[in-house]
Swiss-Prot record:
Disulfide bonds: none
Reactions catalysed: ATP + H2O = ADP + phosphate + H(+)
Keywords: ATP-binding, Helicase, Hydrolase, Nucleotide-binding, Nucleus, Ribosome biogenesis, RNA-binding, rRNA processing
Compositional bias (Basic residues): 565-584
EC number(s) on file: 3.6.4.13
GO process annotations (BP): rRNA processing
Domain Helicase ATP-binding: 47-229
CDD domains: DEADc_DDX56, SF2_C_DEAD
Superkingdom classification of source: Eukaryota
Entry comment, domain topic: The Q motif is unique to and characteristic of the DEAD box family of RNA helicases and controls ATP binding and hydrolysis.
Family statement drawn from the similarity comment of this UniProt entry: Belongs to the DEAD box helicase family. DDX56/DBP9 subfamily.
Described purpose of this protein according to its UniProt entry: ATP-binding RNA helicase involved in the biogenesis of 60S ribosomal subunits and is required for the normal formation of 25S and 5.8S rRNAs.
Official protein name in the record: ATP-dependent RNA helicase DBP9
Amino acid sequence: MAQTSASQGYIDDSSSFDSFHLDSRLSQAIRSIGFKHPTLIQSSAIPLALQEKRDIIAKASTGSGKTLAYLIPVIQTILDHKKADQNDEGATLGVILVPTRELAQQVLEVVEKLIVFCSQEIKCLNLSSGNVSGNLLKSLLTENPEILIATPAKLVDLLDAQDVNIDRLKFLVIDEVDLVLTFGYQEDLTKISERLPLRKSLQTFLMSATLNDDIQHLKQQFCRSPAILKLNDDEVNKDQTKLIQYYVKVGEFDKFLLCYVIFKLGLIKGKTLIFVNNIDRGYRLKLVLEQFGIKSCILNSELPANSRQHIVEEFNKNVYQLLIATDDTEYIKEEDEDLESEKTEDGLVEVVDDSTVTTKDNAKKQKKPKLNVEKDKEYGVSRGVDFKNVACVLNFDLPTTAKSYVHRIGRTARAGKSGISISFVVPLKEFGKHKPSMIKSAKKDEKILGRIIKQQAKLGFELQPYNFDIKQVEGFRYRMEDGFRAVTQVAIREARIKELKQELLASEKLKRHFEENPHDLESLRHDKELHPARVQQHLKRVPDYLLPETARKDNKKIGFVPFHKNSHRKNGRVVKKKGNVQRKGKSDPLKSFK
């Protein structure tokens, strides 16, 4: 099995996992997954955590191998603890906090792969799973699983209910720290810190894509003389040229037109992840594509957690080719791009001792306001979730920040594979010309595009303008107008209600039935047609005259066709010549009338 978790540019070929002197069962699990060499962040963090027992603060982007950088030390130390105290009855020794339920499930899957040969000694439980009822969760917690994975809010709820005991905790991991803070978990983290055991017996990992003032506050709250690791992504990114980025300047209605042409003619090969900026947009696009027989499935914060999890799993198994994901990133504030974290010059990973780090008085600085998310705040799709083998990321709606753009396009061209991203940009002069297809965030598209181009240029990447031959597309416009007209606001509302009913029903089945019958899960599909809008069947077929000449089928020459038709056939039916057939004149009532 090939290296799948980290991008090739992050691999440290000069090191190996054998140099860490891990437990044989853990080493065997790592080999069975397919990992031969650690990544740069792993080769730096694991020795510091295992040998020096240091707290770790790591800054590294998606695909750098952050998950194994903290999981390997956690599992190894728990195994050592079990060997030293064989009479131990079991207790919660490690807690991993993540911002979203999707990421919690993803971390659980990695843990299960790592403990496959020592599952009798280490148990792991995802507290944020939507598949487990409250009573079942309480019964599972009585078994004292060694590792717990949860969102901060879920852990606080269980601590308040005294269902979880962390008095003997040895490890605390906060993954995607910057996203945890963005989602408004600061108060929950404070409550958790008040219940932790003494810092001398606790080892902490803070993993983040950025290091800002908020993380400095968490460092003082949770860490004790941490080692700070900074991965210089700029050096790594220089060798990553397998992601090709395009942008298309297009009107609001023409977004739907281009989507129809792209997917109906199969211009993109492989799986596509489409991002929209709100839930209504996702359903509108799905219903419009349904008009033309193009199947897709929806992923948004309204759906039940276990349905979202199942959709991601099925998408990764290639059950669906087209996934429309709602990315509510309006609450992520754009940071000043000039105040990027300092670049490292000596090597790709810089280890900074906490004693040498000086910080300014943070009290004088005003904290940036966080916008409360009304939908499920434990939902996140553009960041952290591992979508596998995505050929194309299509930004149907341009994100509202350059930072969000980076997270979106990071879903493709992963683990050394190639990929493309296409972003639709609405020029300011085109904004508001077509009210039904309008979205307010498009007013700032050109401004955001400028920021994105500037940011990508710093990383050595280029956004290329992609010019569609509008003459080739114009022939499809009248069909799109017919299809778009059928998708009204009422139809969208009905679609949302119908989808929620279907998914809630499926959610209950997932909780009760599918735990005992996992094979039945294959029959549950999320890309079924909703049909709340009037579907015109003729739109599903594209006539040859609309296709470009290169895409038309070769019409075989029919040859000579005589002017006179075969008299033996009439209106498609064979007519016998013999006397069984009466003359037409005798059957004419006007001629036979007397």
